[in-house]
């Protein structure tokens, strides 16, 4: 079983998942999973952020080693953060244990 990992989530406007994957692979991540989603932000949220919020989203999930998590989050922010057309947010959650991740992560 693998330990010492974080799950990084990036929620971005639809069509920007490839940019996320390019950015995180440059930091040492090996891959991720993309899920199509729909946002539910209301007009008040749009007024607060001062931007138009698209309801069509993609969620990119990437399991990374803890030691590269900060650089992965920074790369996502720089590539598709709120001030970009991707209008993304990113966060991480600890992974207590994982199995079946393949040889790359279990070494």
PLM features: residue spans?
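Positively charged, small/polar-rich N-terminal and surface patches that mediate targeting and assembly
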Residues: 1-107
């Amino acid at each position: 079983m693998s330990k010492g990992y974080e799950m990084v989530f990036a929620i971005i406007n639809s069509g920007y998942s490839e940019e996320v994957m390019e950015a995180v692979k440059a930091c040492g991540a090996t891959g991720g999973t993309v899920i199509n989603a729909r946002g539910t932000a209301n007009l008040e949220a749009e007024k607060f952020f001062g931007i138009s919020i698209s309801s069509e989203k993609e969620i990119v999930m990437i399991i990374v080693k803890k030691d590269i998590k900060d650089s992965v989050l920074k790369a996502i922010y720089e590539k598709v953060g709120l001030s970009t057309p991707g209008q993304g947010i990113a966060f991480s959650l600890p992974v207590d244990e994982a199995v079946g991740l393949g040889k790359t992560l279990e070494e």
